[in-house]
Design a protein with these regions (language model features):
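Membrane-proximal cytosolic segments adjacent to transmembrane helices
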Residues: 1-10, 64, 124-170, 222-274
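Loop-to-transmembrane boundary segments
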Residues: 6-19, 72-87, 155-187
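Alpha-helix capping and helix-loop boundary segments enriched in small/acidic/polar residues
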Residues: 9-13, 114, 118, 148, ...
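An N-terminus-focused feature that recognizes amino-terminal "leader" regions
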Residues: 12-67, 76, 117, 197, ...
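Short hydrophobic alpha-helical transmembrane segments
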Residues: 21-24, 48-58, 81-95, 112-140, ...
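Short, surface-exposed polybasic-aromatic patches that bind anionic ligands, especially phosphate groups
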Residues: 25-28, 33-41, 48-50, 99-108, ...
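A cross-kingdom feature marking solvent-exposed beta-strand/loop segments within repeated
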Residues: 60-76, 94-118, 163-167, 197-217, ...
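Compositionally biased, low-complexity linear motifs
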Residues: 87-101, 144-148, 245
Length: 274
């Protein structure tokens, strides 16, 4: 049954991958008419994204395998780290390639300053990636160890916004929801800033010397979001008592069934002659 579920997941993901590749080809072709540097970055971004997806497919059998943790669940911390890593690495590589076309030397092409605020965001993401498994392992019980091994517990996108414990696995985790929105909004906002950087730079004369800076307040909010995510994950939770079980000392109807008793014949009862 597990094999069938995995095969079904792979079949459902394949059409999206094909559409992604076709859309990427069309998009890069259109961007070549707008800005060469922007086209280089978008092409690099799509290439790195495809490599990440392909690695997941090769090593786990699932195109989204890089987002799946050891519990067979979609991990929000993995999702966040992958988004920031692909975004920043693709922009750095594209900027280096664009600079190389102008500077004609490797030293000048790699002279790109990355703002400390951006490094702080990457550090916060990696901290959440490393801290989430530590928190979960510290509170793991016998029931939690078996979670994710059943065919019905295949990875789903909803895993990134649902609780990690057995007690809240079917409920939305507010700490995950807020962190998901923070991540998406910041990635889109910084992606727009990178688009402006690549479009406004003069590809014939100037090189790209630094990435767009981030506000310290934004980094602080991002850090608070991730801290809340880890702290809420560390809170112990227990299942409510099973109401189907009878309280201690109370007998069930089966226990109240009278046992078969032997009734001695009444000595005054009339005897049937043989």
């Amino acid at each position: 049954m597990t094999t069938n579920s995995t095969a079904s997941t792979q079949r459902s993901s394949t059409p999206f991958i094909i559409l992604f590749v076709l859309g990427a080809i069309v998009l890069v072709g259109l961007l070549l008419l707008v800005s060469l540097r922007l086209a280089i970055w978008i092409g690099t971004l799509l290439l790195l994204t495809f490599i990440v997806l392909l690695a997941g497919r090769v090593f786990t059998g699932n195109w989204l395998g890089i987002l799946i943790d050891e519990r067979k669940k979609m991990s929000l911390s993995r999702f966040q780290t992958v988004l920031w890593s692909v975004l920043i690495l693709s922009a750095f590589l594209a900027a280096a390639i664009a600079n190389l076309l102008v500077a004609n030397n490797a030293t000048g092409a790699l002279s790109i300053s990355i703002p400390p605020e951006l490094l702080g965001i990457l550090g916060i993401s990696v901290t959440s990636l490393a801290g989430a498994p530590l928190v979960l392992n510290s509170k793991k019980g016998p029931i939690d160890r078996n979670k994710g091994k059943e065919p019905s517990d295949m990875p789903r996108w909803s895993d990134m916004v649902k609780g990690d414990d057995v007690a809240n696995a079917n409920y939305l985790d507010l700490s995950k929801v807020q962190m998901f929105y923070f991540t998406i909004i910041l990635v889109l906002a910084y992606g727009a800033a990178l688009v402006a950087m690549f479009m406004l730079a003069d590809h014939r004369h100037s090189t790209i010397g630094e990435f767009p800076a981030l506000n310290a307040t934004t980094v602080g909010l991002f850090g608070i979001s991730n801290a809340g995510y880890l702290v809420y994950k560390a809170v112990p939770r227990v299942l409510p008592p099973d109401m189907s079980q009878a309280p201690a000392g109370q007998t069930t109807p089966a226990d109240q069934t009278p046992a078969a008793s032997s009734v001695s014949p009444d000595p005054q009862a009339p005897q049937t002659p043989a």
